[in-house]
């Protein structure tokens, strides 16, 4: 009994002197490996990893057959596994049957003016849905006019869909005057010294008198197209007025 204790103490003292372990760590059984031992452990670890890699890439054997990879999915080799039947040459993968001569014979040929999947067939004698346009045929509500014919606008019809103007609107016709709501007058042309229409005195004004007494732009109901064959005077702003 005493001999075993002496041997244990000698072994402990030898371990303490051979390593850099503190007395506290030695008492708990801690040891410090030398540099050579650490390098050897690293070499063993690398070698073990490389061995496992070589095993995964090894040639087919009892563990890894030729047509069974590591992931468990069978490979398509010379002999296909029985779990994967071959598809016949005339069988589509979608499950629908292919069209053959027998199937085509069962379906009659549609007539010339019949429907194929809801789409009408157009033949030479089938009328079109779009009507032919004649000389005065309507197109979206508009009427064709010849070269010497001018369309007449209704009395209360706005032009280009614009609403009728009413109320006190600021003037934009500088140097012009409109009387009786229909007659166009213009100031004296300073360059030519001529007076177009009635003379106007005082500063340039733009007023409407008579039944349409309003200031500003005249209402559209005063605009009518010229009579056929007439050539009205034009204003520089594009409006045309007639009595």
From Swiss-Prot:
One GO cellular component term: extracellular region
Induction line: Expression is up-regulated at the earlier infection stages.
Region (Disordered): 187-243
UniProt superkingdom: Eukaryota
Motif (RxLR): 49-52
Subcellular location: Secreted; Host cytoplasm; Host nucleus
Endpoints of the signal sequence: 1-26
Compositional bias of kind Low complexity: 199-216
Main location: secreted
Protein family membership: Belongs to the RxLR effector family.
Record's comment describing the protein's domains: Has a conserved RxLR motif that acts to carry the protein into the host cell cytoplasm. Lacks the 'so-called' EER motif, which is found closely behind the RxLR motif in most of RxLR effector family members, but the presence of an EER motif is not always essential for the translocation of every RxLR effector into host cells, or for inducing a hypersensitive response.
Main function: Effector that significantly enhances susceptibilities of grapevine and tobacco to pathogens. Acts as a broad suppressor of cell death to interrupt plant immunity. Completely inhibits cell death induced by cell death-inducing proteins, including the PAMP elicitor INF1 from P.infestans. Reduces the transcriptional levels of the defense-related genes and impairs the H(2)O(2) accumulation in N.benthamiana.
Name by which UniProt lists this protein: Secreted RxLR effector protein 28
Source organism: Plasmopara viticola
């Amino acid at each position: 009994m005493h001999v075993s204790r002496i041997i244990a103490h000698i072994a402990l003292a030898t371990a303490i002197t051979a390593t850099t372990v503190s007395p506290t760590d030695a008492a708990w059984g801690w040891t410090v490996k030398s540099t050579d031992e650490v390098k050897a452990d690293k070499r063993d670890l690398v070698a073990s990893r490389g061995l496992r890699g070589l095993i995964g890439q090894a040639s087919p054997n009892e563990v890894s057959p030729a047509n069974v990879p590591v992931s468990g999915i069978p490979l398509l080799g010379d002999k296909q596994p029985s779990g994967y039947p071959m598809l016949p040459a005339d069988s589509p993968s979608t499950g629908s049957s292919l069209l053959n001569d027998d199937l085509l014979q069962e379906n009659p040929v549609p007539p010339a003016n019949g429907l194929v999947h809801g789409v009408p067939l157009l033949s030479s004698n089938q009328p079109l849905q779009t009507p032919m346009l004649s000389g005065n045929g309507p197109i979206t509500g508009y009427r064709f006019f010849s070269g010497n014919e001018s369309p007449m606008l209704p009395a209360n019809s706005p032009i280009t869909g614009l609403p009728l103007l009413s109320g006190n609107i600021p003037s934009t016709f500088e140097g012009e005057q409109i009387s009786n709501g229909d007659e166009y007058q213009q100031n004296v042309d300073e360059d030519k010294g001529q007076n177009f229409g009635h003379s106007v005195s005082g500063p340039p004004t733009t007023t409407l008198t008579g039944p349409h007494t309003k200031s500003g732009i005249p209402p559209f109901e005063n605009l009518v197209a010229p009579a056929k064959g007439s050539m009205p005077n034009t204003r520089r702003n594009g409006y045309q007025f007639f009595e």
